Amino acid sequence: AYGIWDHIKNNKEGIHEHHAENYALEWVGALPGVRESRRLVGDYMLSETDILEHIIFEDAVCYGGWCVDLHAPHGLLDFNLLPSDCNFYDGVYTIPYRSYYSKNIKNLYMAGRDISTTRLGLASTRIIGCCAIGGEAVGIAAALCNKYACDPRELAPHVKELQQLILKEDGFLPGFKNEDEKDLALKAKITASSWEQGGEPEKVANGISRKLGEEQNGW
């Protein structure tokens, strides 16, 4: 990192001049970012097929949309491989609740880059945004486990409640709507003097809080 900064800051020759004389390096991470390491096995192991086929799981608690982004296993030492091989696709996919708790340790949740996926599945789910919202889902699930005095696997009958709580906290789950009976906005009649096609005012309260495909889900 310091060698690269030395080049950016001090090199002033021809096309390689970066005009960084007045810039300063304020912070460098103490540890290198680890793209992947050990993963735990849950009741379900998310695969590349699930991602590419945009599977909507009945117990979905998280979603992702990053490409299946594979990097050379040995980094710079893999001279015959491309540094990164990105397999792009359209749309988003969901991650099931069963990928977030351990298969054989009854009171253990996972969140982040250690969830139950194949290596190709992790190539998409490892992205920070996906890890963050997965962590939020696990936190809500843990609170429900406390409420019902149960282990993670035993929470399965309450997964719909978990999903609705995620949506209530401004989460998003493709294929699921806010169905909270106490949410009065869902019962309101919403009108406007004008709108664009696809942005009809009633969609403000259709229970979906994100744009999905061509549907704006907002006014």
Where are these regions (language model features)?
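Disordered, acidic Ser/Thr/Pro-rich linker "stalks" and the adjacent N-terminal cap
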Residues: 172-219
